[in-house]
Structures are given as structure tokens and as C-alpha cells.
Amino acid sequence: MGKLIRMGTQERRLLRPKRLHWSRLLFLLGMLIIGSTYQHLRRPQNPPSMWTKVSSQQPIKLAVRDLPNNEMAVAGSDPPEASSEVEDGMLAAQDTVIMDEAAPSIAMEDTPNPPRTTKIPPASLKNSYSPTTAGTRRQKENIPPTPSGAPSHFISTPGRQRVKSYIPKPRGERKNSSPTHAREKGRTHTPSPAGAHTISPTATVRDRETMATYRLLETRFERTAGETTAASLKRMVLNTPTFLTHEVETNLMTSSSLVGKNTAVSLRKGERNISTTPQGAVPQHTPATSEEQMTVSTRMGSIPATIEGSTAARRINNPLSRTSAPAIRIASATNREKRPSTAPSTLVTPKATMSTQVHRCVVVEPAPAVPMTPSPGVTSILFPETPSSGPSALPPGWPNLHPKAEYPPDLFSVEDRRQGWVVLHIFGMMYVFVALAIVCDEYFVPALGVITHKLQISEDVAGATFMAAGGSAPELFTSLIGVFISHSNVGIGTIVGSAVFNILFVIGTCALFSREILNLTWWPLFRDVSFYILDLSMLIVFFLDSFIAWWESLLLLLAYALYVFTMKWNKQIELWVKEQLSRRPVAKVMALGDLSKPSEDAVEENEQQDSKKLKLPSVLTRGSSSASLHNSIIRNTIYHLMLHSLDPLGEARPSKDKQESLNQEARVLSQTKAESSPDEDEPAELPAVTVTPAPAPDAKGDQEDDPGCQEDVDEAERRGEMTGEEGEKETETEGKKDEQEGETEAERKEDEQEEETEAEGKEQEGETEAEGKEDEQEGETEAEGKKDEQEGETEAEGKEEQEGETEAEGKEDEQEGETEAEGKEEQEGETEAESKEVEQERETEAEGKDKHEGQGETQPDDTEVKDGEGETEANAEDQCEATQGEKGADGGGESDGGDSEEEEDEEDEEEEEEEDEEEEEEENEEPLSLEWPDSRQKQAIYLFLLPIVFPLWLTIPDVRRQESRKFFVITFLGSIIWIAMFSYLMVWWAHQVGETIGISEEIMGLTILAAGTSIPDLITSVIVARKGLGDMAVSSSVGSNIFDITVGLPVPWLLFSLINALQPVPVSSNGLFCAIVLLFLMLLFVIFSIASCKWRMNKILGFTMFLLYFVFLVISVMLEDRIISCPVSV
């Protein structure tokens, strides 16, 4: 059907090429219209309005540093340092007035009150001063030193801000005092009106002349928008919609002040009343300060100002790398006239408009003092200055603090989003999840498959490298965006949340939705979990100092290289481990199922099979070592699932075509285990702890129907074998053989009961006895004969396949009994087995039976037992064949009845296998089709996915088409570009949603983004688990986490360090470290619980893990919001 549909699709495409060309033009035209509309809507948007609303309760704070020693105009005194105030990610503006005999403290606050009044409280001497805080929220800050002044050292503390206070010493030396936390209570600023921000003035008084210089640099910080300021080209002051707040501390009473104004600035002129003060006393913003406060309230508006002379004393320099605002310097001087608070002045009209944006931090840098000529007027000059930028301003040992996330402006303000428009962002974020899954499954993973084929990479290594990258590409790009664009820990949160989602949610869901108890293959899970525990331990140790150095990133990458190397030699390592486990007493579970297989011939056949594997898509087999869903043919893409399966969990198959392909795959798997080389499935067939799922026999439409019937067959065989064992003990004359056989059968029964898997236990015993008593080739032959019986084919057929007999099959019951007798007798003696093997190649089955009767055993009772056993097995086999016949399975049951020669059977089966594999390959490799579906529901889904699929179909060649296979490099690069775009949209809209709701990007990454990027794997894992292959889903979920931890995290960190001169990457977060520790504990719980349940997962354990995931989410969110404190301190 797939071929017909595909041919029909090609014909339809040939019939209507013009429509597709027109659709491409329409699509491009639509994109142009949308882009122009977006630009048009964005123009009238006024960012300051949003900023004023957001920051109405959060005034900006500026860090101020005073003049250096050589620029001081004060004799016998040191420059005081202003302590920075920390409030909501902004620095408080404080200034110091330096005088010959006294330093007046002037706190000027700009409020909308119409009258302008001056309040002069009496001077009071204080011995302690604590930085003021206006808010309860805290944020860490790192203020680099100024180039021209003495360096001051700031220590960055995760989760808590520290404010550095400086105590001046004689001779101009600066002392670094102990940090003061911003939690200390002090004077509280009156919150300024909407959009408050401050500039820091400095006034130096010389002989009744005041020299004040202002230089303001506005830099961006988190969650602020740009502001537009209007300024005069000649001598106009900054014009913004915000107010100015000035705080100056002094020990003198002042009657006049100098105010730098917003808009048309009103400059007030006054004369100082100087009181006596001990000479050399320097007031300062240090814990010991003599202070007096004077508050001047003015009203914003156009106020005339007299503009005379100018001077420059100070400037503000921005050390940050990303600044888009020029510094604004205001130089002013007071006059000598005694005037009230208000003074007549001339009107200044702004003639130029400058747009500035607020950054996180502003640092005042001292400028050379300029000799000033006394002037009776006040001069205010506004001129821009280009700030210095780049990481060179930072000390080499400290990382550069990131500015605000680099996202484009949103069409909707925060208020609009809170009124309901955030629904669009949520829908867009969910839609991008689907888009990422489609890009990865339909284009990126097939391109990686072509690359692995071109490079001749083995399946295990490809599954651990390229295919893991295909499945984890969204997490990798999210981590890159978090480091370089959003400047947050969203990437770490996404990867940690995705890891917990895969460990707990995916595995628990697989256990809940599987039809039977989920039996796990122990080696892939044990191997991957061991590496994962090692990687997580390294990550926890590296997180302890809240910085990731370049060599730590390199160590994580080397851990991934070690994992790839292990996957390269996976089979050899697996065999060595199981050899060590097999040296235990015989009474224990035999861990060495197929260790006798790898002979020289088997190795040669294995190499041939490896070359064959590179040409075919990997078949997802139970017990496979690679255990990757991304390189398996059962992995269904989201696009096909949504269009071809409306209820994937209900019927456990995407469609009728998929059902047929899966039934054919089940037959191929059973035939492959019997016919392929012994070493091909060697790691897959290690029965010691390799547990085969035992589904209910009445499960329909599932590829586990064959094992369901095998269960009945094997139970019947075991009952018959035990009865045969008793008969042998009574009648056989060879006592030693009887004793060995009885002990072996008893051990077999115990092992089977322990593992609750009759098929694997029987295979173990047969292989172990064959290993101990026969040569390696005979052990392979016998083991394969046993395996054939377990895969739903009768032992007669299996014996014929392995030993190449040409015999005419008689009655099925008698034939099975005789073949079972051969199988048992072969295991009872080396000489007997070898002679039987030589004669069986030439004789019919009857002659073989006569031969065994002449081997010295008492045959009558034994023959009766074996005949009865054969009847029991025949009944079970008849039922199994009937079930398979009803479901369309024609593997071993049909070939038992009518074929006359084994060679013809093998040829037919090989042809069927090749045809099935070709059909599966063609079906799996079917390119993306834009064919219009039939049903209404599928048409709606088709239209829903069309905005994603159509641009991809236009821009990326599909390598699943033979003619486009040569363009795999373009597909690879194009897929990466699309994944990066979709990941950027996902993180941006998640940031907008989090900003609207009020949660951080780290929490969004832990919860929403982690689940969204992992849902495609969840759907595939559940579907595969319902088909009886849940162990692959579990192993793949752990294996994909290794790629995230060892590649998704360190690659962006290493790139950041290389770009920024090997600086470490700050990764501190409130609850992220504790979340990683929780992930580690959850992993240990999952592994120990699974191991204690003998590598089986029932629904109760799955439900417990399901609940643990939500417990992890709640704890992580509470840790991130500091509702609870992390018991593990960093």
C-alpha cells in the first residue's frame, strides 16, 4: 500500500506542478506582508511607557565613586567613597560634597509637588551609617573599578548582594571595609513617581564658589526598556519623563542648592551659610558619617534658568560591554548671590533628541579637575560622551556580568499580556514544541543517518553520538541561547528538568501504559546509568563555586568521549563483564548465555553483518546494546503520528499499514535470531539477566503475540522435561548422566521461577550445558536450535535449519517429541552429541531415533515420556499457529507444515526477510508528503501543521528521496538553522510568559521547556513500550541524558570561555544546584528500585515515579523562589 500511495503521490505532484510554484510565491508574499505589518505595528510602540509602569516602584540606583587623590581640592582630607545602595537590581545614587572646611549634605528629590521648598534640619553627628534600601528584593552586583582611580574590589556572592563601603585613610589611601548586606535597614527613600532614575552630582566648594559636575550614563539592566531623552545641543540638560533623586550628606547647614533637572531643568541658585567645623574633617558615606540632610522638592516642567560659566569635575564611565547610551555630563556652578530657593532664569529649549537605554550598572569615574573662574551665574552644559565598553574594563579573574536578555521588543506590553494576550505566547510556545519535533524527526535525524552511512560509523557509536545529537538538539540550542542571548540559566534548567522528565516521567509512563510488567535489559541500563552517575557527580562538584572554568567544561566533554569509546567497544566490554559474572557457582543464575558463540567464523560473519547493518535502518530488537530510539525504525515521527494515528495509545499502532509492518517486523526479529550469525545479536541475547517480556496471550495487534504463545509452549516443554527427567532416573542405566541431567533440570526450573521467564531460562540452560559438554560450534548449533523453538517455531524446524538436514516431516506431534529427545540427548554427553551430529547430517529423523535407541539407554519409558511431551508441545504449538494465522503471522508455524526440504525453507525465509526489511526501509524512509488527507479530522490536523511543514518542505531537501540524498550537507545545516530559530522563539516566548506570570526563566526551563522538548520522545517511548519493547525506551531515556549533561551544557560554556579570554561562566542560581542534587538522588532511587525488583517494573512502581516527578517540580520551584532553603549549601 505504501508503494501505491507513494506512486500516486508522485503522479499527483507531476500533474500539478504549477500550483506548487504558485503556492511558494504566495508563501513568500505572505511572509513579506507579515514582516511589514510587524514593522508597522512596532513603530508607534513607546518603550518608555512600559518601563515607567514597571519601574514606578523600582527607582534606578547609580554607583558613585569620588575624585582621586591627585584631583582633590581639599587640604588635608581624603576623598570619601559613596556606598552603593542595592535595590531591585539597580544601584542607588549618592554623592559627596567636598569642601575646604566643611562638606554640605544635600538630598535633592524631584517630586511632582508644585511648590519648591527647602527643609534644613539641624546638623547632627552620626557614628554609623548603613546603606539604605527601598525594596525588599535583592540582586547581586559586581562593580568593576575605574581606570583612573584606585582599584576597589568587589566580591560577587551568589544569591545575595553586597555593598562595598570605603573608609578613607590619611595620605589618600583607600581601605576596603567588610561588605554590608543590603538587608540592613536604614533610611528609606520615598518611591519616586513612574520611571524614576537618578544622576549623581558632586559639588566641590572653594572659597564661596561651588563647582558641580554631572556626568550621567544610563545603562540597561533587567526588565527595562529604552528611554528617550531630549537634550539641547548647546547648553540644555537631560530631558526624560523620569525624576531625579539626589542624596548628599554633609555636616553643615545649607540654604541654597544646585539641582540638575529633567525636561527643561530648573537650576536653583543660593548662597551657603558656612558654619565652623574642625579643619580637615571629611564627611563621607562610610559607617562613620556626620550627616545633615536637606530636601528640595521641585515640580517638573519648563522652568527658566540662568546659564552662565561652566566647569567640569566628574564623569561617569560604563565598563559594561553592551551599552547603547552616551554619557551625559552636566557642569554647573553656583553664584554668590543670596537668593531664595527659586531664581529667575532664562528658558532653555531642547533642540536635539537622544535615545538612551538603561543598563544594569553605572559607575562614576573621576575626571581631572579644571581651574574655575568665579562666575556670578550657574551654567548647565549637556554634552554626550562615548562610554568605554568591552570586557577589558573588568578584572581578568572575574566573569563579565550579563546585561539584559537580548530579545526583540514585544508587541504587547506587560499589562496587555496580563489582560489575556499572553495566551498567544503560550500557544506559540506549544506550537514551537511541535515544530522542533518535526524538524528533528523529518530532516535532522535522516541527515545524520546519511552522515553515519557515509562515514561508515558502527551502529552503537552512531546511536551514542549522531542520533543522540538529533534527539537532544533542542536542549543543546536552548543551552546556547541561555549562555549567549538570554544570559540566564534557562539552558541549565531545561537540561536538568529534561533529565528528570526522562528519568521519572518517561520511565514511569512506560510502566503505566505497557500491557504487561515492563521487563528491562540490564546491561544497557547499567552501562548508561553508571556513566550518568559519573557525569552528574562531576557536574555537582563543578557547581560548588558557582563558576564553570574552561577546564571543567573540557572534563565534561572528555567524559562524553569516554562514553563514545565505551560504545565503540561495547560488545567486548559486555562480554568481559559477563565473563566475570559467570564465574559464580552453577546453582546461581548463569550470566554467560552466548559467550560460547564468538568463534572465528562468528566474528567473520559478524563483520559481514555489520557491513549489512550500515545499509539498512537499525531494527529495534529487544536487548539491543545501542538502545536508541532515534536510530530505530519503530520511531514514528510526530507528523506521521498526528496524521496517521489519532489514538496511538488505544490501539498501540499508528495505522493499519504500521500494524502490518510491525507484524512483519516481529517475524523478522524471530527469524533473525534463528538465522543470522551467532554474534550479530550477541549482546542482545545474554539471557542471564536479559529478561524477555511475557505478555498476555490474548493481546491482539501486538508483536508480542509470538512470545505469548511461546510461554505456553515452554511451560508444556518444562512439564514434559521434568517428567522425562523422572523417567530417566528410573530407567536409564547411566547413573552419572542421570544425576547431571536431574541437577541441571532442577537448576533450570529454579532459574526460570526466579526470573519468571521460561523462554530465557531454557535458552540459558541449553547454552550452558552445550558450553560445558560440547565444543563451541556444537554449542552454537544447539543454542540456536533452542532459540528457534522459543521464537514461535517448532524445534524440528530449528534443528533442520541449524544442522542442514533434508527430511520429510511427518506428523507434527511425533516429530516434535522426537526432536525434543534429540535436543535432550545431545546435551547429555559430548561423545553422544558429536556422533549424533555427524549422523544427523546424513540420515532421516527415524534413523536418528534408532541411533539414539542404541546408545545404551533404556528407551521405552523415555520414549513414552517424550511422546507425551511432544503431544503437549504440539497442542501449544497448534494454538500458537492458530493465533498467528488469525493475525496474519506466517513465520514458523506455516513453514512447519508443508515444506519438504530445509534449504528451500531457508531460501524462502531469507527472501521474506529481505522483502520485509525493504518494505520497512521504504516505509520508514518515505519522504515528507504534502498530500491532502481524506478524513475531515486529518485535514484539520494537516492545516494545523502546514505552517510548519510547508516552509521546511520549501527550504530543506529531504534526504529520504534518492535524488536528494546527495544534498545531505544542506539538509544538515538547514535543519540546524531551523532548530536554532525555533529554539530561540521557544525561549523568548517562555521568557515573556514567565515575565507575565512572574516566574523566572530557570523555573520555566525546569518545567515547561523541559517537558516540551521531551514530549516527542515520551510519545515514542510509550508507543514502543506498548509494543513490548519498553526496555529500549527506558535505556534510551537514560542515554539521551548523557548527551545533554556532557555536551549540551559544556559546549556553550567552553565557547563562552574561549570568546571571553578563558573567563569562568557564572552559573549561580537559588535552587538550580539543589535541583541537580535532587536529580542525582532520583536517579539512584530509580536504579535501586528497579534492581531490587529484579529489573522488572510494575505499574505501582511506575505510578510512584510518576508522582515523584511532580514532587521534584514543586520542590524545585520552591527552592528557586526561596520559599524553602536548599539544605545542601554551596
UniProtKB/Swiss-Prot annotation:
Domain of life: Eukaryota
Post-translational modification: The uncleaved signal sequence is required for efficient membrane targeting and proper membrane integration and topology.
Entry's Gene Ontology molecular function annotations: calcium, potassium:sodium antiporter activity; symporter activity
UniProt GO cellular component terms: plasma membrane
Compositionally biased region (Acidic residues): 703-715, 766-782, 802-820, 870-880, 896-928
Keywords: Antiport, Calcium, Calcium transport, Cell membrane, Glycoprotein, Ion transport, Membrane, Phosphoprotein, Repeat, Sensory transduction, Signal, Symport, Transmembrane, Transmembrane helix, Transport, Vision
Extracellular face of the membrane: 1-419, 486-489, 552, 960-966, 1024-1041, 1092-1099
Membrane topology designation: Multi-pass membrane protein
Family classification: Belongs to the Ca(2+):cation antiporter (CaCA) (TC 2.A.19) family. SLC24A subfamily.
Name of the protein: Sodium/potassium/calcium exchanger 1
Species whose genome carries this gene: Mus musculus (Mouse)
Lineage, uppermost ranks: Eukaryota, Metazoa, Chordata, Craniata, Vertebrata
